[in-house]
Amino acid sequence: MRDMGRSDIVISAVDALDIHIAMTSNACDKYPAKQHARRVAVKLGVSTGLVYLAGQPTVNWGDSDQPRPFRQRRYFYYLSGVDEADCYVTYDIRNDLLTLYVPDFDLHRAVWMGPTLTVEEARERYDVDQVRYYASLQGDVQRWVDKYNQSSPLYILHDTQRPRVSSNEVRFDDESLLPAMDATRGVKDEHEIRMIREANRISGLAHRRVLENIHRMSNEAEIEGLFLNTCISHRAKNQAYELIAGSGENAAVLHYVKNNEPLRGRQLVCLDAGAEWNCYASDVTRTFPLGTDWPSAEARHIYQLVEEMQEECIKRIQKGVRFIDLQVLAHVIAIEGLMRLGILRGGSVEEIRESGASTVFFPHGLGHHVGLEVHDVSAKDLRASDADRDYYNSVLTPSTSHGPCTLSAPALEEGMVVTVEPGIYFSRLALANARKLPYAKYIDFNEAEKYIPIGGVRIEDDILVTSSGYENLTTAPKGEAMLEIIRRGIDN
């Protein structure tokens, strides 16, 4: 691996300007935890009860004195906005009282790790009604149980997260809270949208930096290193998911994360990487050549096909649309394009779609929700009719069992953020397996194998559903703008 020293990195005028912007625009208002708590109560459909949520505790690796990297539990964060370990939150629905519990002061820990959050600091920082130390938690919950629990349930996410109380007849409800919170989390408020937008802005800068410097790189690891460096230097220390930097045939591996192979002799790189900002994810994929233009007709044709799939699906996003219908559209466009290239043949577009042959090349869902998780949660709706199920089964694969592509998913709503990430891949394993399946008659395997060296192409943006249509939150360059950045990087 070449040393990516300071002198090797190109800093564009856009990045230089951004440094000033980042320093002056990151003072955000409080996370709207109280608003979220009230929304959850509405979804629960009750006027009494106590919501109890535990944050992520400090945990060491097995057989080690070293702590695991901290990652806050997202349901807890949604009702608190607190990204600190060993905290708890309760919401008394009857009294509209949101209470945060922070760790008791520990002198030994403070000396070694720095002081923990005080109740005074927490009151100033977070949108809660009161803050107390952990020592008060058990007694506070016990008093609520003694006063209200005969008529009101104590809501928990899972049976394993029960608080310690002395009564054996506590009315725990571990079935209602999760779906209520999923329903509220599926639609983002303005604060959440700002966080996702900022995560996308930083991810866009990192993708741009990779494009500017790709001609200097000799290994996938250098791509990963520069992307992470750019995000961290913009104060986005955490990635929303493990970075994927697959070159050549590795681009056909959907979740390739080794990122350690040489780039020499390969055509394309599929870079699927997104920063996290204040616990909110971005999810961005770009596929680009290891040169100033597409290295082969095959690479250009597949990129243009995936580009068409994405553009046609994005422009149809609006509230009321069922995402599964966009999934079908993406497959239809893919089939038409692969038929033009001679890869699919021997039937009509509808016959090939119904056979499932297109899933050999497009094996995943068109997208998913984005929020506190990169594959975020959402409400569920009644399942489609059997007739609908028969129609859609040909484009539903195991990877589409969750998210907006499922038959059970509701129509898109204003405030949802979803990815649109079509892809076309040429996997040796998938093609070998397809030879044994009934739809093999629709595939020209000799023609398909000519495309194996390109690996695959995926393009992914994060799309906000608005009152009038959609807004693309992703700023990473793609298409001709992407190629121009690569060319300018070489010129510099």
UniProtKB/Swiss-Prot annotation:
Keywords: Aminopeptidase, Hydrolase, Manganese, Metal-binding, Metalloprotease, Protease. GO terms for biological process: proteolysis. Gene3D superfamilies: Creatinase/methionine aminopeptidase superfamily, Creatinase/prolidase N-terminal domain. Mn(2+) 2 binds at D272, D283, E460. It catalyses: Release of any N-terminal amino acid, including proline, that is linked to proline, even from a dipeptide or tripeptide. It comes from the Eukaryota. Mn(2+) 1 binds at D283, E421, E460. Its cofactor is Mn(2+). InterPro entries: Aminopep_P_N, Creatin/AminoP/Spt16_N, Creatinase/aminopeptidase-like, Pept_M24, Peptidase_M24B_aminopep-P_CS, X-Pro_dipept-like. Signal peptide: none annotated. Its EC number is 3.4.11.9. Coiled coil: none annotated. Binds 2 manganese ions per subunit. One of its GO terms (molecular function) is metalloaminopeptidase activity. Catalyzes the removal of a penultimate prolyl residue from the N-termini of peptides. Belongs to the peptidase M24B family. This is Probable Xaa-Pro aminopeptidase ACLA_020440.
